[in-house]
Amino acid sequence: MGYHGGTMRVLGRRIYWRWYGEVLLEGGVTLRMTGDVAKWLRPGDRVRLRTEFKKPVLGFDEYALEAAFPLWPPFAKTLEHVRESPFGGEAYRYRLKVREATYEGDYEAIAELEQFHYASEKEVVALWVCTQCQKTIPANAKPLCDCGGEARLKEIRGSTPASRFLVLELAERLPFEPRILGYLRLDPPIPRMHRRTPEGVERDIRERIFPRDWFHPTYEGGADWQKALDRVNTAAARIARVVVHPDYRSEGFGALLVRVALEWAKERGAPEARRE
């Protein structure tokens, strides 16, 4: 990629969805990226931009961005995974891509996998919002709003505004095989709900640090969440969840996702990409 832009200052950000946001740089440049990346860039941050294009708005595939860590394009790793035969040798070879969730369809696939994780029709795994009337609709699958408007995925059950996701994608698949085989959720190292100290047991630690609506119920938004994200600067990351499609749970994909997540956290400083 050719060099144009150099070191620039972040002026602002707009977060629309987990899969779509914009970052405004000095000089009138707007970068389109996922909301899960854009929300970590604070006004005043210095970033390094590389692009071949001289235009005010740069799309997903038109630039690279770095700060303390590479920020864009999203993390991705292509690999092969061999299933061995019980009699020795290779039984099957998967060609896979492990990457950060980037597109709306990725998050819809995550919501679908959550249904396998909870395995109960009584458990609602996602929140959707109508783009016409702005009504929030709890549902396991994409619902139809009463007003006739299109519902789009807003949030995944149990996740927080700080959560970031890796998806395990079949790079080569047969028509009957799912595109996304599993996912991993990476969070800041939020303390456990209760902890034991010399003085006794401290309860509900997370709610003392983060807004209550991050956990009860699944996050729906609030005035304080971006301020909380702006203060995050961790020395570690926490693997909060690993879910694999039930038809593929004997293939070692869960362990594979964990190994790649460790690379992601090391190479990109995920989730917030600020620690030194």
Identify the role of each PLM range:
Residues 125-127, 156-159, 163-165, 173-245:
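Conserved acyl-donor/pantetheine-binding loop and adjacent beta-alpha core of acyl/acetyltransferases
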Residues 1-17:
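Structural detector for short beta-strands of small beta-barrel domains
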Residues 244, 249-266:
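Conserved acetyl-CoA-binding loop-helix of GNAT-fold acetyltransferases
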Residues 61-104, 129:
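Conserved N-terminal entry element of GNAT/NAT acetyltransferase domains
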Residues 140-150:
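Cysteine-rich micro-motifs
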Residues 3, 34-50:
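Short nucleic-acid-contacting surface segments enriched for D/E, G, S/T with interspersed K/R
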Residues 17-24:
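Short aromatic-glycine-enriched beta-strand elements
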Residues 235-237, 258, 263-276:
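Conserved GNAT acetyl-CoA-binding A-motif
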